[in-house]
């Protein structure tokens, strides 16, 4: 396996040019940022929640989180919402405005919960994604979507900006090498002791690393204590400011 890894890294070093990240994320209507990963446990939910909080603070504007995976309430330290959510909404033949399901988290951040529908995020069809994108585009709120793990081209294609959350993991990068749709940028969760780094990830994915987040225990403690919404770690918000 070591020989295979070394050969693969050598190939990565000579791969195609990585496009520059030229997007800005203004707090304007129709701006939808989709955060996604290729494997569970990559940190997508924490990144999604923290990015929404950072955007609201930096822009002094309303930001909402669409939770397709169901873990955002736990990450934010709020009670699990009851009632319908985005999965129920997508399965309704006649839909009320999606903002009717928004739950306040802070003064400027709200949540559209996953809900109790049987629809899983990896079951989203092109019709589902187009319906959701059209609805979100009608609002003047900036939206961050936690799309969980799995490659959902229909969802990524409808995003203003898509961010792949990934660790420098050989297995994750093997999956990334076969993506049919590339992200606009990468949030790299750095772990000590990994053989792979930023250049390897950029070469395989074909997109620039916008943020390198250290695997910091203070972030985990903040989430475990339910304090992310009220006391986002400074280090986390400072790093995500490069995206926001």
What residues fall within each predicted segment?
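Acidic-aromatic/histidine active-site loop/patch
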Residues: 1-33, 79-98, 127, 174, ...
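Walker A (P-loop) phosphate-binding motif
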Residues: 20-63, 68
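Generic beta-sheet signal
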Residues: 31-35, 63, 112, 141-145, ...
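A generic structural signal for short coil/turn motifs at secondary-structure boundaries
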Residues: 41-44, 75, 119-123, 222
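Phosphate-binding loop that captures ATP/GTP phosphates
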Residues: 58-111
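Cytosolic-facing regulatory segments adjacent to core modules
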Residues: 96-105, 111-152
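A short, acidic, flexible beta-alpha connecting loop/helix-capping segment that sits on the rim
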Residues: 116-117, 215-219, 227-228
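Conserved catalytic-core segment of NTP-binding enzymes
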Residues: 131, 135-222
